[in-house]
Amino acid sequence: KIFTKCELARKLRAEGMDGF
C-alpha cells in the first residue's frame, strides 16, 4: 500500500513522532 501524506502524518503522530 502507498501511504498518502495525511496517512503518514497520522501514523507518525500515533507513534509519538509529530514532525509535520
Swiss-Prot record:
Disulfide bonds: none annotated. It is an enzyme of class 3 (hydrolase). Its EC number is 3.2.1.17. It comes from the Eukaryota. It catalyses: Hydrolysis of (1->4)-beta-linkages between N-acetylmuramic acid and N-acetyl-D-glucosamine residues in a peptidoglycan and between N-acetyl-D-glucosamine residues in chitodextrins. One of its GO terms (biological process) is killing of cells of another organism. The keyword Cytoplasm does not apply. One of its GO terms (molecular function) is lysozyme activity. Keywords: Antimicrobial, Bacteriolytic enzyme, Glycosidase, Hydrolase, Milk protein. Belongs to the glycosyl hydrolase 22 family. Lysozymes have primarily a bacteriolytic function; those in tissues and body fluids are associated with the monocyte-macrophage system and enhance the activity of immunoagents. Monomer. Lysozyme C is capable of both hydrolysis and transglycosylation; it also shows a slight esterase activity. It acts rapidly on both peptide-substituted and unsubstituted peptidoglycan, and slowly on chitin oligosaccharides. This is Lysozyme C. It comes from Felis catus (Cat). The gene is LYZ.
